[in-house]
Amino acid sequence: LNHRFNFEGLDVLMTHIGGYPGKYNKRVRMIFEADPPKLFICGHSHICKVMFDKEYNFLHMNPGAIGHHGFHKVRTMLRFSVGEGLIKDLEVVELGIRGNNVKTNMN
């Protein structure tokens, strides 16, 4: 399933399985060819990665995995702010080794 929305002037498309620049699946590639977003967020690979897609002119984000199950070694997420259609203060938050309960202060 896709979720497309506008937040603070930023056109965002989120989906679970989407791929990476140059290797998108057909479903999302068709969306990009018709009307690309400014921010594309997808997951599935459990690999935390942020990159700019020059072909479709948007920022691609995969927050990694925050859960305790999977092949990832470190639990990750992305934190950022949005204002006036721009992404600001992007950071990777590491929540510890997969399988360990780690208390964090997420203020």
Where would I find each of the regions flagged by the language model?
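Core catalytic region of metal-dependent phosphoesterases/phosphodiesterases
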Residues: 1-9
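Short, flexible loop segments at the rims of nucleotide/cofactor-binding pockets, characterized by
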Residues: 15-21
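Structural motif
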Residues: 10-12, 39
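Conserved beta-sheet core of the metallophosphoesterase superfamily
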Residues: 22-86, 90
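Charged phosphate-binding loop/patch that engages nucleotide di/tri-phosphates or the phosphate backbone
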Residues: 83-107
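Active-site-proximal loop/helix segment associated with metal-binding centers of metalloenzymes
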Residues: 8-10, 70, 100, 107
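Short, flexible active-site-adjacent loop segments at beta-strand->alpha-helix junctions, enriched
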Residues: 18, 66, 96
